[in-house]
C-alpha cells in the first residue's frame, strides 16, 4: 500500500485494516508479544474490534482472536504502562458486541479486569504506569467514568468504591481536563501520536457519556484536534513543530499515527498500517465537520497558520489555574512542569511515598531550599520536559511546509520538544537538533528532541535557528542537520549552502560554522525498520550534516517553482547573500525577504520592521480568527461554517 492511498468511508477503512491483518496479524497466541506492535502486541485487539464492527455490518471476516484480547487483559491486570490504551476498545466490545461477536466467557473476563483496575493515583497499589501526562490523563479519566457508569452498583475491590462513586470521582477530573483543553489547547502540541491518544480517550465519551454536555464537549475537542491537523498537515503527514516527538515519526512519516486518521477523514495520508484511533473513530461513526474538511484541502497558494497553545506557569493564576490549588496540579503535570517553584509544594503531595517521580521533585525542592537559605539565585522553572506557552507559525504551499515553535524556552534543557521542521513531501523532511545521545531509544536522543533548546524563529519562508549549548555538556557541543539527500530529486552544495529540490519545492540550508557529512548510521535503520533495515540502509545516502561548536546559527529558506522559477534561479538568488555576525548579533541578507536581523537576546526584524513572535491568537489563519482563551471557535471554509461553542456546549456544522 503506497502513500497515495486514501480512505474516507468508515467501513472501507475497517475492511482495509482487516485486509492488512490477513498478512500481518498473528494467528496463534505464541506469535503475540507485549510490544507496541499494531497487530500482534497488546494493542492488537483493535484489529479484532475492526472485525467485530464489520461482522455487525454483515461483512465476513477472519475469526475473532480471543487470545489478542487476553494479551490486553494481561497488561491491565499487571497495571503496566499504556494499559489504558487498550480500554477504549474493551468498552466498545462490551457495549456493542457482547453476546454476539464477543462471547460471554470473554466478556466476563473483560469485566473482571476492568473492575479490578487501578484508575487513579489516589487508589491503593504501586504505580508502574504513567497516569499523568496530558494524553494519559484523558484515557484514565474516560475509562473510570465509563466503566463506573456501566457498573454503578458493583464494588471495585482495589479501593472499595462502587462504580457510581468511581463515575463521580472521574467526572470531577474529566471536567477539569476538558476545560483546560478547551481554553488553552494542548500542551503536547501537534504530536503525531499523542493527538490520536487524546482522541482515543474522547471518542467513547462522545457516544456513551450519560451527561449530554460531556458528549458534545468531547466531540468538539475531537473537532479541534482534527482542525489542528487540517491546517498544519502537508500531503497527509504532519511535518511541523511538535510538543513531543519520536524518531520513527519524524524520520519515517509513514509511521505517523495521525496519517491514518487523515486518510480516514480527509482523503489524505497513509493507511499502510492500523491506527487504533482511526479504528475507534470509524467504529463510533465520527463525522468531520464540513468546514474542517474544506480547510484540510491542499492549498492552492500560500497558507499561513499562527496559533498559540498552553500557558506559562507564571501566568496560570491570571487564567484562574492557581498552582497553589491542589485541584489544579494535574494541569501542570500534564504540561510536565512538575518541579517549577510555583508547583513543587503540590507536586510533593502527589506521591507522598516513593515513586520514580519522587526523586526528581524532592531534589528540586531541596535545591530551592538551599539556594534560598544562601540567598543565591536559582532557576525557578527547571523542568526539561516543560511544554509551556507555545506560539506556532506554519507556512504551507502546494510544494513545501515550514513550521516553527517561535522562541520556545531558548537555552533550556530539552526533552521531546521539536522546535521546527521543513518538508518537501514524504520523507524529504529537514530539521536540526542538539543531540543528547547517540542512541535512538533515549529521550531526548540523536534526532528526537534536544539536549539544549535553540532559539528558533520563522517569518514566512525563512527560519533562523540559534544554538548556544552549555559548556558543561562536553560530549554534545555541536548541532546537526537532518537532510536526507536520497529523498531529494536534486542536491547541490555551493558557497556554504546546501540546496535540495523535490518536485517543485526547494530548500536552502546554511550553517554559520563549517560542517561535514557524517557517514550514515546502520543503528538508525535497525531502530526504524527492523527486518527491512538493510534494504533501506543500502538505498540511503548520508543524511547527517554536523557543525561542531557550542554556538551556531542555521538559516533555512524555502522556495518553489511558483515562487522562484527554476531550481537554478532559486540557487542563483543566494549568490553574494551573506550571513554575518554570530548568535548574539546576526544579519542575513535573504533573497526573498531582504535584510533580517536577529540574536539570542535581540528581536527578529525583517526589512527594519520588528516581527511579533509571541502572544499569538489561539488561531490566526484564513479559516479561523480566535482569541486565546475564548469560549468558542468559529471556522469558515468552502462555504461551510463550524462553530465549537464550549461555554454553551453547542456544536454547529452548516
Model-identified regions with their sequence ranges:
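Ser/Thr/Asn(+Pro)-rich, low-complexity disordered segments
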Residues: 3, 8-139, 152, 161-174, ...
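Contiguous, well-ordered alpha-helical segments that form the cores/surfaces of helical PPI scaffolds
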Residues: 88-92, 138-150, 196-208, 224
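N-terminal hydrophobic signal/anchor transmembrane helix of membrane proteins
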Residues: 145-167, 251-262
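Short catalytic/ligand-binding loop motif for oxyanion handling, primarily in non-cytosolic enzymes
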Residues: 154-155, 197-198, 404
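Short, solvent-exposed loop/turn and secondary-structure capping segments
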Residues: 156-159, 181, 237
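Internal, well-ordered domain-core segments that constitute the primary functional module
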Residues: 166-232
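Extended amphipathic alpha-helical segments with heptad-repeat/coiled-coil character used for oligomerization
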Residues: 203, 212-286
Amino acid at each position: 500500500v503506497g502513500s497515495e492511498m486514501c480512505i474516507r468511508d468508515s467501513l472501507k477503512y475497517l475492511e482495509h485494516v482487516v485486509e492488512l491483518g490477513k498478512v500481518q496479524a498473528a494467528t496463534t497466541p505464541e506469535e503475540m508479544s507485549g510490544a507496541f506492535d499494531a497487530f500482534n502486541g497488546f494493542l492488537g485487539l483493535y484489529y479484532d474490534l475492526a472485525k467485530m464492527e464489520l461482522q455487525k455490518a454483515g461483512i465476513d471476516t477472519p475469526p475473532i482472536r480471543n487470545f489478542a484480547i487476553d494479551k490486553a487483559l494481561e497488561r491491565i491486570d499487571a497495571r503496566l504502562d499504556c494499559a489504558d490504551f487498550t480500554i477504549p476498545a474493551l468498552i466498545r466490545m462490551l457495549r456493542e458486541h457482547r453476546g454476539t461477536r464477543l462471547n460471554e466467557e470473554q466478556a466476563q473476563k473483560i469485566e473482571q479486569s476492568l473492575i479490578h483496575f487501578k484508575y487513579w493515583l489516589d487508589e491503593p497499589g504501586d504505580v508502574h504506569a504513567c497516569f499523568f501526562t496530558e494524553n494519559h490523563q484523558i484515557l484514565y479519566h474516560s475509562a473510570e467514568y465509563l466503566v463506573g457508569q456501566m457498573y454503578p452498583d458493583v464494588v471495585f475491590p482495589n479501593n472499595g468504591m462502587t462504580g457510581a462513586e468511581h463515575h463521580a470521582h472521574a467526572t470531577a477530573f474529566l471536567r477539569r481536563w476538558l476545560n483546560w483543553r478547551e481554553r488553552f489547547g494542548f500542551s503536547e502540541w501537534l504530536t503525531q501520536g499523542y493527538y490520536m491518544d487524546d482522541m482515543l480517550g474522547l471518542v467513547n465519551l462522545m457516544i456513551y457519556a450519560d451527561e449530554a454536555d460531556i458528549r458534545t464537549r468531547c466531540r468538539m475537542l475531537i473537532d479541534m484536534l482534527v482542525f489542528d491537523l487540517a491546517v498544519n498537515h502537508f500531503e497527509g503527514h504532519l511535518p511541523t513543530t511538535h510538543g513531543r516527538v519520536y524518531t520513527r515519526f519524524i524520520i519515517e512519516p509513514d509511521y505517523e499515527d495521525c496519517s491514518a486518521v487523515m486518510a480516514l477523514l480527509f482523503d489524505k495520508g497513509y493507511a499502510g498500517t492500523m491506527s487504533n484511533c482511526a479504528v475507534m473513530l470509524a467504529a463510533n461513526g465520527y463525522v468531520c465537520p464540513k468546514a474542517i474538511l474544506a480547510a484540510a484541502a491542499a492549498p492552492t497558494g500560500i497558507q499561513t497558520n499562527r496559533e498559540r497553545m498552553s500557558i506559562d506557569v507564571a501566568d496560570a493564576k491570571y487564567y484562574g489555574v492557581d498552582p497553589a490549588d491542589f485541584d489544579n496540579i494535574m494541569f501542570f503535570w500534564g504540561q510536565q512542569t512538575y518541579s517549577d517553584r510555583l508547583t513543587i509544594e503540590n507536586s510533593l503531595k502527589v506521591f507522598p511515598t516513593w515513586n520514580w517521580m519522587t526523586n526528581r521533585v524532592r531534589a528540586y525542592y531541596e535545591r530551592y531550599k538551599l539556594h534560598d537559605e544562601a540567598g543565591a539565585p536559582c532557576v525557578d522553572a527547571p523542568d526539561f520536559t516543560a511544554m509551556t506557552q507555545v506560539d506556532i507559525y506554519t507556512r504551507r504551499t502546494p510544494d513545501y511546509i515550514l513550521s516553527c515553535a517561535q522562541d520556545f524556552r531558548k537555552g533550556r534543557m530539552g526533552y521531546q520538544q521539536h522546535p521546527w521542521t521543513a518538508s518537501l513531501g514524504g520523507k524529504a523532511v529537514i530539521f536540526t537538533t542538539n543531540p543528547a545521545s547517540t542512541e535512538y531509544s533515549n529521550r531526548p536522543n540523536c534526532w528526537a528532541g534536544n539536549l539544549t533548546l535553540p532559539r528558533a524563529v520563522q517569518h514566512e519562508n525563512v527560519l533562523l535557528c540559534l544554538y548556544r549549548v552549555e559548556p558543561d555538556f562536553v560530549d554534545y557541543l555541536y548541532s546537526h542537520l537532518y537532510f536526507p539527500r536520497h529523498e531529494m530529486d536534486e542536491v547541490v552544495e555551493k558557497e556554504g549552502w546546501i540546496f535540495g529540490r523535490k518536485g517543485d519545492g526547494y530548500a536552502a540550508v546554511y550553517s554559520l560554522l563549517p560542517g561535514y557529512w557524517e557517514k550514515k548510521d546502520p543503528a538508525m535503520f535497525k531502530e526504524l525498520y527492523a527486518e527491512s533495515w538493510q534494504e533501506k540502509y543500502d538505498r540511503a545516502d548520508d543524511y547527517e550534516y554536523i557543525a561542531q561548536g557550542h554556538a551556531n546559527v542555521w538559516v533555512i529558506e524555502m522556495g518553489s517553482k511558483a515562487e522562484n522559477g527554476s531550481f537554478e534561479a532559486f540557487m542563483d538568488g543566494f549568490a553574494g547573500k551573506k550571513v554575518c555576525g554570530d548568535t548574539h548579533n546576526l544579519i542575513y541578507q535573504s533573497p526573498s525577504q531582504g535584510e533580517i536581523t536577529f540574536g539570542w537576546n535581540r528581536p527578529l526584524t525583517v526589512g527594519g520592521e520588528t516581527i511579533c513572535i509571541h502572544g499569538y491568537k489561539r488561531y490566526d489563519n484564513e479559516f479561523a480568527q480566535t482569541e486565546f482563551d475564548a469560549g468558542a471557535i468559529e471556522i469558515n471554509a468552502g462555504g461551510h461554517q463550524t462553530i465549537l461553542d464550549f461555554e454553551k456546549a453547542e456544536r454547529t456544522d452548516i
